[in-house]
Amino acid sequence: MEVKRTKGVLKRIAGPVVTAVNLDAHMYDVVKVGDEQLMGEVIKIKGEDIIIQVYEDTSGIKPGEPVENTGLSLSVELGPGLLTSIYDGIQRPLEVLVEKMGNFIERGVTAPGLSHDKKWEFKPIKKAGDMVTPGTIIGEVQETNIVHKIMVPPYCDAGKIKDIKSGSFTIDEIICTLDNGAEIAMMHKWPVRMPRPVTEKLNPDIPLITGQRILDGLFPVAKGGTAAIPGPFGSGKTVTQQALAKWSDAEIVVYIGCGERGNEMTEVLTEFPELEDPKTGRPLMERTVLIANTSNMPVAAREASVYTGITIAEYFRDMGYDVSLMADSTSRWAEAMREISSRLEEMPGEEGYPAYLAARLSEFYERAGRVNTLNKDFGSVTVIGAVSPPGGDFSEPVTQNTLRIVKCFWALDAKLSQRRHFPAINWLNSYSLYLDTLSQYYDENVSPEWNPLRTWAMEVLQKEAELQEIVQLVGSDALPDEEQVTIEVARMLREIFLQQNAFDPVDTYCDMTKQFDILKAIRFYSDQAYAALKAGVITSQITGLKAKNDLPQIKYVKEYKPEIERIVKTMESEFTKLREAA
């Protein structure tokens, strides 16, 4: 009988990539490297050579040190205690690590992803004799104000419940046994690289309401959709991501800081626990899982952090929740792939990125979706990935490959951010391919006028862009009267509708009804202005209308309805006077 070699020795070390020999291993097995037991993962097997990427700093380890195979693939612990947690890329809770070793993470330290000592109150919703299948929800735990649903792990066989308990248990204790011998605890493990199974994927036809006018109004993303936010440095990617994490109508938010600046992660870690969830008034952190993996942490862990995040998101989706996952930024993950690929001496592709860049990106984004879960509930994972192209160049491989996969593209523009136009999303370069599938939702839930209004707004903004070249050459006064009005209406759309103050308590979130009312008021001004032109009113009188100057203040008024009605009435009477005078 062949003896399984679980211990080998190090032969070669090249930064985060090490080679071991005399070791039996499968692809993606987790191994412990060196005397300090650093965590690594098998990424290539070449004859006797086992090539491992190490998730911790390898300085100081030398050839000849032992390598031990755990025989397990990289997995996350899924169960009560996930919400409010702050993890590093390999699901080590940072709060536990601080207690173990202070503010700086030492090497070779492990900590379980969930607390194995804390007791949770388990309420069964199934009883003995009930038939259960993989993914069936058998009970509930009130974790925060969110109910954590305990399910039969997807790898378990179907069977009848033999015994199910009620009361306080730790996540390791058996709470349910099936007649086929399966024992179910509140926690189960799942390999991060394997998508969790579902009954079927559904057409994403419900929008993710974000409260950001430019996103909901012009470029909506569906629940279960994918969106990319590319943009150069300082254009507001992280602020946009954080606004989405705070305000989007997803029930759970998973925020992955993947290779971003440490200070930005610090901001998230200090801000999120203090922020209030606008829907419940509870701390926002109670529906959030944070994965902090800053740029000075080992590069290999960036890949792990992305997979860890999406696996946790899929777990909550399987409970029937709508989850939004923010990955900030996927470019750093791609750079980590490039570094490891070059250490492996693989043939480089475009700009040095590996040839499998597109495959890895699509593997990640394709795990998004609105689904019918194994428990026959509806859940969704919406993935919003930030991309940081060097120098703001959208033609580089990461941006281009991401564009091929995602259906919603929010292009951030440094020029807009320099003009202090926030969110700095360029309405000419951005697009959403969800408009057709979402139009029915808007007709039924906002107004049948919504879709024509949106189309009109986009046409005005495009027309303004075409006229801008002439304006820069000869000035707006040289344009025909109609086009001068078009430029004024476009300015109103930009300054009143598209600009939004993320730091104003009212304007930071704008619901769909208010968005519709603001657009309708601008459209009303536009229609009246063209009618006045035909009646012979001069352009300067139309653009100098007093009532329209009150419109921008609507954004900052909570109970805005009476105010907007007053402005529209005043506008109407002013236009009537102008027409009569003409």
Curated annotation (Swiss-Prot):
Subcellular location: Cell membrane
Gene Ontology biological-process entries: proton motive force-driven plasma membrane ATP synthesis
Keywords, alphabetical: ATP synthesis, ATP-binding, Cell membrane, Hydrogen ion transport, Ion transport, Membrane, Nucleotide-binding, Translocase, Transport
Membrane is among the record's keywords: yes
Molecular function in Gene Ontology: ATP binding; ATP hydrolysis activity; proton-transporting ATP synthase activity, rotational mechanism; proton-transporting ATPase activity, rotational mechanism
Catalytic activity, as annotated: ATP + H2O + 4 H(+)(in) = ADP + phosphate + 5 H(+)(out)
Domain of life: Archaea
Enzyme Commission designation: 7.1.2.2
Matching HAMAP family: ATP_synth_A_arch
Function, in words: Component of the A-type ATP synthase that produces ATP from ADP in the presence of a proton gradient across the membrane. The A chain is the catalytic subunit.
Family the UniProt entry places it in: Belongs to the ATPase alpha/beta chains family.
Assembly and interaction partners: Has multiple subunits with at least A(3), B(3), C, D, E, F, H, I and proteolipid K(x).
Protein known as: A-type ATP synthase subunit A 1
Source organism: Methanospirillum hungatei JF-1 (strain ATCC 27890 / DSM 864 / NBRC 100397 / JF-1)
